[in-house]
Swiss-Prot record:
Organism of origin: Campylobacter hominis (strain ATCC BAA-381 / DSM 21671 / CCUG 45161 / LMG 19568 / NCTC 13146 / CH001A)
Molecular function per GO: manganese ion binding; RNA binding; RNA-DNA hybrid ribonuclease activity
PANTHER family: RIBONUCLEASE H2 SUBUNIT A (PTHR10954), RIBONUCLEASE HII (PTHR10954:SF18)
Enzymatic reactions: Endonucleolytic cleavage to 5'-phosphomonoester
Protein name: Ribonuclease HII
NCBIfam families named among the record's database cross-references: PRK00015.1-3 (NF000595)
Length: 185
């Protein structure tokens, strides 16, 4: 039975979207592994190869949607959408991690992005697509250096928030304890 791998990117950042990708490989691709263990250049090369040689879908949630529904609900909605999309393919669906976020129709596996090539491919799809969005946001909001930090809470990013406040892609529901009282939404 073929496998559909699912992984996400953008669960922990202070800013930007959440991307959840599902992928069925139609051809073997060399060099697949967890996206975090690949250079940005290598991820970009593999991303292009994956989209040419797979059936895939990427579900995206904006910072505003994450604030409105909550991260867990967005994950549940995204996982359900991917399960529905891939159901006709009669595949075994594996999601990286140990939580189903209330969704059904798939298995979870810790470190699946290291163990299962389809999950590695999904990891790359989610990461590269999200990183591209963050590079575009860097042009619109240059003070935050989103091209470099991808919205994560680096020291420079937190200092930029302290200096310039939050921008429209910051997750209002992700309060930084040491910034409370300094900044208001």
């Amino acid at each position: 039975m073929k496998i559909c791998g699912i992984d996400e990117a953008g669960r922990g950042p202070l800013a930007g979207p959440l991307h959840i990708a599902g992928c069925i490989l139609n051809k073997q691709i060399e060099g697949l592994k967890d996206s975090k263990k690949l250079s940005e250049k290598r991820r970009e090369i593999l991303y292009e190869e994956i989209i040419k040689n797979s059936t895939y879908k990427i579900v995206k949630f904006s910072a505003a949607q994450i604030d409105k529904f909550g991260l867990s609900k967005c994950l549940k909605l995204g996982l359900n959408e991917l399960v529905d999309f891939f159901a006709p393919f009669e595949v075994k669906i594996i999601f990286d991690g140990n939580s189903k976020f209330g969704a059904e129709g798939f298995e979870t596996m810790v470190k699946a992005d290291d163990k299962i090539k389809e999950v590695s491919a999904a990891s790359i799809l989610a990461k590269v697509s999200r990183d591209r969005v963050m590079r575009n946001f860097d042009i619109k909001f240059p003070f935050y250096d989103f091209a470099k930090n991808k919205g994560y809470g680096s020291k420079a990013h937190i200092e930029a928030i302290q200096k310039y406040g939050y921008c429209e892609i910051h997750r209002k529901s992700f309060h930084l304890k040491h910034l409370q009282g300094i900044l208001e939404f």
